Design a protein with these regions (language model features):
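Membrane-embedded transmembrane alpha-helical bundles that form the catalytic cores
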Residues: 1-213
Length: 213
């Protein structure tokens, strides 16, 4: 504490020097900290919990009582619930840390604005994605293009993320699906990109929820 278990993940080189800095809390910094905390609580208590209790849990508990449209809406809604819950939690952590004199990195950057699976992971859980990129993806050669090994590394990278977020049973399947979506966008031609972008918008929303479901 104040760096909490679920993130943001802070590297020692960034956090330890802050332990030796004199404590200083300006009015502007205090106001920003309160904003982060209230924003996180709003996401968690108002958006995530309300969606879960009033709609999503009801559909998932008794799907036979609902239409296909309602079930699909619940699936997309669950993606939003996961985002609001997780990002709300880390927003509160950032705000509390700021009140205590520490600066933690931003952990989400509007991930559901992404137009592809690759962009989704550049926006989702930034501290985890960056850590895995620097210590797993790049050292294994994932930034090389066009080789079979690079495809396998993309798959391994996404499976590792699934394992980190505690989804071992779905990790392999979702690793395949995410890697497939990533490679589809990465290697498609210009003529195909418009179609693939719209497919990936839907794929990103659905898999984003399933990954944490």
């Amino acid at each position: 504490f104040p760096q909490l278990v679920a993130g943001p993940i802070v590297r020692a080189s960034e956090f330890i020097p802050q332990l030796y800095q004199p404590y200083a809390l300006t009015k502007e910094r205090a106001g920003l900290a309160v904003f982060w905390i209230l924003n996180g609580l709003l996401k968690k208590l108002v958006l995530a919990d309300y969606l879960a209790v009033q709609f999503i849990d009801r559909v998932f508990d008794n799907p036979q009582l609902y239409s296909g449209f309602e079930t699909m809406s619940a699936l997309f809604g669950y993606s939003m619930q996961v985002y609001a819950d997780f990002s709300g939690y880390t927003d509160v952590a950032i705000g509390i840390a700021m009140l205590l004199g520490f600066t933690l990195p931003k952990n989400f950057n509007s991930p559901y604005k992404a137009s592809s699976v690759a962009e989704f992971w550049r926006r989702w859980h930034l501290s985890l994605s960056t850590w895995l990129r620097d210590y797993l993806y790049i050292p294994l050669g994932g930034n090389r293009t066009g080789s079979i090994a690079s495809y396998l590394i993309v798959f391994l990278f996404l499976v590792m993320i699934a394992l980190v977020v505690d989804q071992p049973l779905l990790s392999v399947l979702l690793g395949v699906l995410f890697a497939g979506g990533y490679l589809l966008m990465r290697y498609s031609t210009t003529a195909e990109r418009w179609v693939n972008t719209n497919i990936n918008l839907m794929l990103t929303m659905i898999l984003g929820g399933l990954w944490h479901g």
